[in-house]
Amino acid sequence: MTQQAKEPKFIKNGIYRKDAVPVRDKKPEWLKVTIPTGQVYGEVRKIVKEHRLHTVCEEAMCPNIGECWSRGTATFMLMGHICTRACRFCAVDTGNPMGKLDLEEPAHVAESVRLMGLKYVVLTSVDRDDLPDGGAYHFAKTVTAIKRENPGTRVEALTPDFGGNPHCVDLVLESGVDVYAQNLETVRRLTHPVRDIRASYERTLGVLKHAKQSRPDVITKTSIMLGLGETREELREAMLDCRAHGVDVITFGQYLRPTMHHLPVERYVSPAEFDEIREEGLSLGFLEVVAGPLVRSSYKAEQIVMDKPGNLPEHLAHLEGKEQLSLI
């Protein structure tokens, strides 16, 4: 009698339904988005489905999916749809993937990039604590495949923390990435109410510091959500911590509750306050600060071109004039 292979079990949207907080907030006007439509949107969706790919746009219920897909851009989410962690802000499924990997994924992603004609690609992934290297080799292999099939295409890697293992970080850095990102997500005080207990404020900063020290020529980047109960003083502390750890670019966006079973929104931050935060960040020396209600780590990643000749720091001077090299 043939024994059937066990299928991974997971929790849909990453949160048990018993954790529901029955609060329905009316979103302000500035957070309203259009319904996804259009020929380009349909073509991107078709390519993603045909190549059995996952995108963070879909899995994380991103509000910008219509705008980004209609522009022919997407953020690819590697290593499946099941994350081994359960952050309380995130809609990605959580569970045990049982070591399963699609070994054809790097080639499929590279081909999709070619079919879409992308000049700038953002790669992210679920956490894979079930794998000895956290998926670092698979991540690096995907970057290499993209670069091989799409010469001139720039790649941003938004990685897991790999348990803080510097050798795993180096695997990705040595694959040819142009931007290395790891998200802080929130301020120090709120880290464990917001992120999985295995995540760490200090570890994320350590990963970013190691990335900058190992590859000074690679742009380092992080992202923080607002509206979870943080204060402006705590935000400034987080920005100072990022600068002290060599972070070049930081983004700020409004936290939006993906389901009723996730953390509630404490407040909606106005566009004017986002503008103030951007100016404060620039005054602290960031190469770029992107802040706005609908800003996400990879939002409009391909459109913010480095057009600051003569103003780049020495360690990034080689990037001047590079077409379509984005800061976020």
From Swiss-Prot:
Pfam families: LIAS_N (PF16881), Radical_SAM (PF04055)
Its EC number(s): 2.8.1.8
A GO term from the CC aspect: cytoplasm
Superkingdom of source: Bacteria
Positions of the Radical SAM core domain: 69-287
Disulfide bonds: none
UniProtKB keywords: 4Fe-4S, Cytoplasm, Iron, Iron-sulfur, Metal-binding, S-adenosyl-L-methionine, Transferase
Cofactor note: Binds 2 [4Fe-4S] clusters per subunit. One cluster is coordinated with 3 cysteines and an exchangeable S-adenosyl-L-methionine.
Subcellular location: Cytoplasm
Gene3D superfamilies, A to Z: Aldolase class I
Binding site for [4Fe-4S] cluster 2: 83, 87, 90
Metabolic or biological pathway, per its Swiss-Prot or TrEMBL entry: Protein modification; protein lipoylation via endogenous pathway; protein N(6)-(lipoyl)lysine from octanoyl-[acyl-carrier-protein]: step 2/2
Positions with a binding annotation for [4Fe-4S] cluster 1: 57, 62, 68, 298
SMART domains documented for this protein: Elp3
Entry's Gene Ontology molecular function annotations: 4 iron, 4 sulfur cluster binding; lipoate synthase activity; metal ion binding
Record's catalysed reaction(s): [[Fe-S] cluster scaffold protein carrying a second [4Fe-4S](2+) cluster] + N(6)-octanoyl-L-lysyl-[protein] + 2 oxidized [2Fe-2S]-[ferredoxin] + 2 S-adenosyl-L-methionine + 4 H(+) = [[Fe-S] cluster scaffold protein] + N(6)-[(R)-dihydrolipoyl]-L-lysyl-[protein] + 4 Fe(3+) + 2 hydrogen sulfide + 2 5'-deoxyadenosine + 2 L-methionine + 2 reduced [2Fe-2S]-[ferredoxin]
Major subcellular site: cytoplasm
SUPFAM superfamilies: Radical SAM enzymes
Listed cofactors: [4Fe-4S] cluster
Enzyme class, spelled out: transferase
HAMAP family membership: Lipoyl_synth
PANTHER family in the cross-refs: LIPOYL SYNTHASE, LIPOYL SYNTHASE, MITOCHONDRIAL
Family the UniProt entry places it in: Belongs to the radical SAM superfamily. Lipoyl synthase family.
UniProt-recorded name of the protein: Lipoyl synthase
Lineage summary: Bacteria, Thermotogati, Deinococcota, Deinococci, Deinococcales
